Amino acid sequence: MQQRELNYLFLKRIGINTHQEPVVYMRQDCHVCRSEGFNAHSRVRVTTNKRSIIATVHQVTDGWLSHQEAGLSDAAWRLLEAEDGEVAYFSHTKAVDSMSHVRGKLYGASLTQESADEVVKDVAGGLYSDVQLAAFVTACAGSRLNQDEVAALTSAMVKVGQRIDWGTSPIMDKHCVGGLPGNRTTPIVVAIVTACGLRMPKTSSRAITSPAGTADTMETMAPVNLTLAQMKKVVEQEGGCIAWGGSVSLSPADDVLIRIERALDLDSEGQLVASVISKKVAAGSTHVLIDIPIGMTAKVRSPEYAERLASHMRYTGVKLGIQVEAMFTDGAQPVGRGIGPALEARDILAVLRNQAEAPADLRVRALTLAGRLLEIGGVASHGAGVARARETLESGAALHKFMAICEAQGGFREPALAPHCYEATADRVGVVSFVNNRFVAKLAKLAGAPSNSSAGVDFHVKLGQKVRVGEPLFSIYAEAPGELAYALDFLRDHPNEIRIEEESL
């Protein structure tokens, strides 16, 4: 009898969320661990009649698993497409040869195109453990990648994912580097640009550390989980879409690396550029506008860093054959009023519907970005883009196009707000002098956003605005009293993150 035929266990779903890391749970004294010499954190190949994955071993010492069972984390279960009681075979994995490039980078070697290809291929293939992934992320953190290394990493990321060919040019796109709550211009921009005859198939992300991503916000108004075939049908019909990028495998290695970056709380200039540009190239974009908000509590805190980031993006775009342009914007305070999926969607609709109460700052930002894209795309002359965008918005053409896109994606619905609300008011007379973007984002998340799409924070004031005692500053919306209580506890513990100063005479 072959060894493989002995090394089998029956699979059991145990309902543990390991944050996308495939983990297999085995009795320490089961026959497979003993015969193969598996230890805690061993990397093993798990094979069924349908699929094969690599997972990390966690060993169990008590009786909640039998000696004949192997438990799978949610991530492993999903990747393996397993069924309860299904037979799986276990074996050692080969050493990951590309780790030599990671070690080399840690000791000062450069990342070549060949080494980047090997590392990224293994990352996307699930060969790296979280420890090995952390080593690679650390090796590339900060400003440790030069422009050619960034371009090599970006190219490698594109190679391991799907790449969409729309069969025409130009294909317009935009991206915001983030860090600014409420800056949800994308649905407005897509509506304006496509209403003017350009193609803009927008794949957007869900929130990672923010209270809402564009996909989360759009999902409160229309379905966003589109297959590639569905995306192409919507774009063919309407000229654009606003879909969740995770539903098509555009840059699978990037999704893995982002998870590790967030866990380590590491910002990598090079990996940020590679992440953005790889997904734009894979999405088939030819002309990309990057929105870089600058502010002391935004992701990008200085004009110098913004310019360096923009330079990296332009250089990498040229290397990969797309046109990239950057636009620097004000990141001193949240944009619009709503922070959280449904609240941001409400602001978007107010702008598209030309309502009097629509947030002026969100409207101006969207018109500025859309106007520049119209110029880049050749449907407006230089300097005339904003006027063309404004005309498209005010005529109702942008709203009509947005509704058509929603219907093509599965149907439009009005976003709903959470039932529990607390209104924070000013405790003094003065002028709003400071708003901490990170505090506002954390407050919205504690209220339940983005998992509860109707939760979040609704701002009533802007920097420089005069307020009186008792005047509303912002409202917190939550689905449950407990979530509202979490947010209020945080608010009480951080009293100076929104400051009011006496007006100078």
Swiss-Prot record:
Q: What is its EC number?
A: 2.4.2.4
The record's listing under SMART domains reads:
PYNP_C (SM00941)
User: PROSITE patterns, alphabetically?
Assistant: THYMID_PHOSPHORYLASE
The record's annotation in InterPro entries points to: Glycosyl_Trfase_fam3, Glycosyl_Trfase_fam3_N_dom, Glycosyl_Trfase_fam3_N_dom_sf, Nuc_phospho_transferase, PYNP-like_C_sf, PYNP_C, Pyrmidine_PPase_CS, Thym_Pase_Put
Which top EC class applies here?
transferase
| MF terms (GO), sorted A to Z | 1,4-alpha-oligoglucan phosphorylase activity; thymidine phosphorylase activity
Does Isomerase show up as a keyword for this record? no
Which keywords annotate this record?
Glycosyltransferase, Transferase
A single Gene Ontology CC annotation of this entry is: cytosol
For this protein, what reaction is catalysed? thymidine + phosphate = 2-deoxy-alpha-D-ribose 1-phosphate + thymine
GO biological process terms, alphabetically, are: pyrimidine nucleobase metabolic process; pyrimidine nucleoside metabolic process
Keyword Transferase carried by entry = yes
Please, which domain of life does this record's source organism belong to?
Answer: Bacteria
Q: What NCBIfam families does the annotation carry?
A: ARCH_P_rylase, PRK04350.1
List the HAMAP family. Answer: Thymid_phosp_2
The record's family statement is:
Belongs to the thymidine/pyrimidine-nucleoside phosphorylase family. Type 2 subfamily.
Spell out the protein name for this chain: Putative thymidine phosphorylase
Provenance organism? Hahella chejuensis (strain KCTC 2396)
The record lists the lineage as: Bacteria, Pseudomonadati, Pseudomonadota, Gammaproteobacteria, Oceanospirillales
